[in-house]
Amino acid sequence: MAAPADPTWQVGGSLTHSSGDYGTGSTTTITYIPITIRRLFDSGDISLVIPYLSITGDCGVTLLSGTPNSTGGTCPTRTTTTGRGKGKEVTRTRQTRTTEGGIGDTILRGRYYVLEGSTTVPTVAFIARVKVPTADSARGLGTGRFDETFGTELTQRLPSDFVAFADAGYTLIGHVPGAGLRNQWYYDLGLGYYLTKTVLGSVYYEEWRAVVQGFQNPQDLLFALNWTATDALRFNTALQFGLSDGAPDYGITFGASLRF
C-alpha cells in the first residue's frame, strides 16, 4: 500500500490585537485578521495573505506588510465655532480620532531553502515579499504604494531540544509624496525549546528601522507557542511586549492552520 502523499496546501487564519502610542503621544489600537493560503513545495513555499484590519487612532500609525509603523500622519482636524454672547465667537480646532476598517494590503511572499540543516549546519532560506496596495490609503489603512522585501532566515537545531532562530531583511518602501518614508531594515534573534514533541515555546528579540526619521526604532520581545496537534492541524499564539516608544505597548495573537 502506497504511503499517503505529503500535504501540498496550507490554509490558516489568525487574529492580532495591539495597542500603543508608537512614539506619537496618541494611542493607536489595531486589530489585524489575515487569511493565508500557502502552496508547499519540497524546496520552499509561496503564500498569499489577504487581511482585514481595524485601526482606531489619529492616523499617525500605518501598517506596512502587516506591521504597525509610526508614519507621522494625522487625521484631518475639525474646527468648531461657538457663540459666547455679546456677538463674540470662539473657534476651537480639535484633532479627530477615527476608527477605520476594511481590507488591508495583500501580501505575496515566497521562501526558498538553499541549505538543509543538521545538528552542525543551520537551515538557510531566502525570502521575498511584495506588498500590494489593496488597502484604502485615504482612510489610513495603508500607504497606497507597493513595497518589496528581501531577506534570509536561519534555523539551527541545538542539543537538549533547543532551537535557535535568526532572520534579517530589507524593505524598499514605496514613495509617498511629502511623507518622507525611508527604506527599512529589520532583524530578529530567537531561541526555542520543545516542551513536548509537538509543542514549541520560543522567545524573540525584534528590531526594525523607523520609517520616518526622528522616531525611535521599534523594538520588542515576542513570546510564541506553537502546537502541532496533528499532521494536518496546527495552532499558535504569541504575546508581544514593546521595548521602545516606536513599538506597540502590547500585542496578542491567536491562530490556526490546516494542511492538506
Q: What function would you assign to each model-found segment?
A:
Residues 2-175, 181-260:
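Transmembrane beta-barrel domains of Gram-negative outer membranes and organellar outer membranes
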